[in-house]
Regions:
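Non-catalytic, structured segments within soluble enzyme domains
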Residues: 1-8, 180, 185, 196-200, ...
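Active-site rim segments in enzyme catalytic domains, especially the processed small/beta chain
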Residues: 71-106, 113-123, 128-131
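Ligand-recognition elements built from short beta-strands and adjacent flexible loops
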Residues: 321, 340-501
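Short hydrophobic alpha-helical segments used for membrane anchoring or interfacial signaling
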Residues: 39-44
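A penicillin-recognizing enzyme superfamily signal
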Residues: 7-27, 38, 51-54, 59-86, ...
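Short, charged, amphipathic alpha-helices and their helix-cap/turn boundaries
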Residues: 170-187
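Conserved catalytic neighborhood of penicillin-recognizing serine enzymes
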Residues: 103-175, 235-265
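Extended, hydrophobic alpha-helical segments in both membrane/secreted and soluble proteins
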Residues: 48-51, 89-98, 105, 162-163, ...
C-alpha cells in the first residue's frame, strides 16, 4: 500500500471531454440502450489523455440505473465491452494497404457495382474465416457513388461501392495486417475478421484502439501503444518508472502522408465537415456508421492529439436516426474535445503526399480503344493490366462489331485490375447531310439519295418586310446536319414560304 500512481490523463481536457459527453448523451433513454465514449491519446507517445463516457462507472453489487461496470473505451480484458462495429472508419486500413502496395490516390476504381462475388476476394489468412464465396450485396449512404471514382474521392465521401472495388484488388489478409500494424485488434480478443465486408467495418473494436491507430498515421506512420501511467511513487517517496513508451513504425512516412491527404479532406469537405473546428489547426479524420446506423463514430487527429468518439447501442440494433440529433452527436462531442485539445497542444500541418503515391501504378485508358474490334480491345486492355468485359450493343455510326464506347472516359487513370466495359456498335447510324439553304425539293432529293425517306415539312411564313426570294428555301432542319441517325429517323425541314397554307 501507500503507492501514489500518476496517470497520463490531462484533467483539464478530461473535464472538457466528460462535459461534452454528458451534455449530449444521457445515462439512459427510452428510445434505445444508448452509450457513448470519447477517448484521446497523445500523438507520438501513446499517453491516454481522456476517457469519458455517458454512464458513471460503478462495479458494486448495487449499481444505480444509468451506471455501469463496463468501460466502453477499452478491450474486454481491461474491464471493457466487446467493442463496437467501427463502420467506415475501418476503410482507412484498406487505404493504407493500397498505398503500401504502391497504388495511387488518383487511381480510379469502379463504384457502380452493388453486388460482388466474394470468391473474387483474395484472402491468404488461415484464421480469417475464408475462403469466401457467394454474393455480397451492399449499398452506399445517401446515394453516393458512380461509374468511376478516384480513391481520394472515395475516401472523402466514404463510398462503399468504391471501397469494395479497392478491397477486391487487395489481399484481405494484408488489409488486416495494415490494421494490426497500427495496433488494431478486436476488443473480444478474437482475430480480426477478413471477410470482404470487413473493409466496411464489421469488426468490433474498442474506441481507445481506434484513437491510437489514427494517432499512428498522424505521427508519420509511427504507432505508439496506449499507456495510462506516467510514474509511481512508493510509500518512502521513491519514484518508480511508469509504463514505458512502446512505439514502432507501421508504415513509411510517405504512405502516412498520402493516407492523411484524403483524411484531411474528409474534415474540410467530406463526410466529417460537422467535426471541422475551423480554428486553423489541421485535422485528419474519418466517420463511421453501421448499415442500420445503430453505431456511429468520429475518429480524428491533429499532429498532437487523436480522439475517437463513439455514440450508439450498448445492446440492441435501434437506429441512431430514431434518436433526436442522433447522427450528429458524435460531431458535437468531437468538436468540443478537439477545440480544447487544440488550445492546449496546438498542431502543425501534415506533409504533402509524394507524387509517386498520387498516380501510383495506375494506367491511363487509351482513346484508341474506340473503333477497335473486340479482340483488339481485349488484347490492349488486358495487356495494360485491366479487365475486359462486353457490356452490350449500341446504335453507332462505326462499323458493326467495333467498340463504340467504354465505361470510363479516355485518359482516366484507372487502377490496375479495374474492369472496363465496352459497348459494341450495331453499325446502324449514318451521318445526316446538311441541307439548310437548299430549295425544299433539292433538299428532299439529297436526303433521299443518302437513304433518308421519312421527311416532313414545317412552314415558316416570310414576314411582310421579309425577302420573298427566300420562298421555298430550307432554313432549319431537325436533326441538324452532321448528326448520326438511323435511316428511318423522322426528319423535319423548316421551309420559308410567302404564304403557309
Amino acid at each position: 500500500g501507500g503507492y501514489e500512481i500518476y496517470t497520463t490523463l490531462n484533467f483539464k481536457l478530461q473535464a472538457a471531454a466528460q462535459k461534452k459527453v454528458r451534455e449530449n448523451v444521457p445515462t439512459r433513454s427510452t428510445i434505445l440502450n444508448i452509450g457513448s465514449v470519447a477517448t484521446s491519446v497523445e500523438v507520438g507517445t501513446g499517453r491516454i489523455l481522456t476517457m469519458a463516457q455517458n454512464r458513471p462507472f460503478n462495479d458494486s453489487q448495487t449499481p444505480k440505473q444509468g451506471q455501469t461496470a463496463v468501460n466502453y473505451a477499452t478491450d474486454r480484458d481491461y474491464g471493457g465491452s466487446s467493442g463496437f462495429q467501427v463502420g467506415s472508419t475501418y476503410k482507412i486500413f484498406a487505404l493504407v494497404e493500397w498505398l503500401k502496395q504502391g497504388r495511387g490516390l488518383n487511381e480510379v476504381v469502379d463504384a457502380s457495382r452493388f453486388e460482388l462475388n466474394q470468391a473474387a476476394f483474395l484472402d491468404t489468412c488461415d484464421d480469417g474465416g475464408g475462403p469466401w464465396g457467394g454474393p455480397w450485396k451492399f449499398k452506399n449512404s445517401g446515394g453516393a457513388g458512380g461509374a468511376a471514382m478516384s480513391v481520394f474521392n472515395a475516401t472523402v465521401n466514404s463510398v462503399n461501392s468504391a471501397y469494395a472495388s479497392i478491397a477486391e484488388q487487395l489481399d484481405q489478409c494484408q488489409i488486416r495486417a495494415a490494421a494490426e500494424s497500427l495496433g488494431v485488434h478486436r476488443a473480444d480478443g478474437d482475430p480480426l475478421e477478413t471477410n470482404p465486408s470487413a473493409v466496411l467495418g464489421t469488426n468490433n473494436i474498442a474506441p481507445l484502439t481506434m484513437a491510437a491507430a489514427f494517432a499512428g498515421i498522424a505521427n508519420g506512420g509511427v504507432f505508439c501503444e496506449p499507456i495510462a501511467v506516467d510514474r509511481i511513487v512508493d510509500r518512502d517517496g521513491v519514484e518508480l518508472d511508469g509504463q514505458t513508451q512502446d512505439c514502432r513504425r507501421a508504415m513509411t512516412a510517405e504512405v502516412a502522408a498520402a493516407a492523411a491527404a484524403p483524411m484531411a479532406a474528409v474534415i474540410t469537405g467530406g463526410t466529417a465537415t460537422a467535426s471541422n473546428i475551423g480554428d486553423g489547426v489541421p485535422i485528419i479524420g474519418k466517420t463511421g456508421s453501421t448499415d442500420s446506423f445503430n453505431q456511429t463514430w468520429m475518429v480524428g487527429s491533429t499532429r498532437k492529439v487523436a480522439t475517437a468518439v463513439w455514440v450508439g447501442n450498448v445492446k440492441g440494433q435501434v437506429s441512431m436516426l430514431n434518436y433526436p440529433g442522433g447522427s450528429g452527436i458524435r460531431h458535437i462531442i468531437f468538436r468540443g474535445i478537439m477545440a480544447e485539445a487544440n488550445r492546449q497542444y496546438g498542431g502543425g500541418g501534415f506533409p504533402a503526399p509524394p507524387s509517386s503515391l498520387l498516380a501510383g501504378s495506375g494506367v491511363k485508358l487509351p482513346a484508341d480503344v474506340i473503333g477497335m474490334t473486340q479482340e483488339q480491345a481485349k488484347a490492349l486492355l488486358e495487356g495494360l493490366g485491366l479487365r475486359f468485359e462486353v457490356g452490350g450493343q449500341v446504335d453507332s455510326a462505326l462499323e458493326a462489331g467495333r467498340v463504340a464506347g467504354m465505361s470510363f472516359s479516355a485518359g482516366t487513370l484507372l487502377a490496375r485490375g479495374t474492369t472496363v466495359k465496352v459497348t459494341i456498335s450495331r453499325g446502324n447510324l449514318v451521318e445526316l447531310p446538311n441541307v439548310v439553304g437548299q430549295l425544299y425539293d433539292d433538299a428532299v432529293t439529297a436526303l433521299n439519295a443518302a437513304g433518308f425517306t421519312n421527311i416532313s415539312e414545317s412552314c415558316a411564313e416570310i414576314p411582310l418586310d421579309g425577302d420573298p426570294g427566300q420562298d421555298g428555301i430550307v432554313t432549319a432542319q431537325n436533326p441538324a446536319g452532321g448528326a448520326k441517325v438511323k435511316y428511318e429517323r423522322s426528319i423535319t425541314l423548316t421551309v420559308s414560304r410567302v404564304v403557309c397554307s
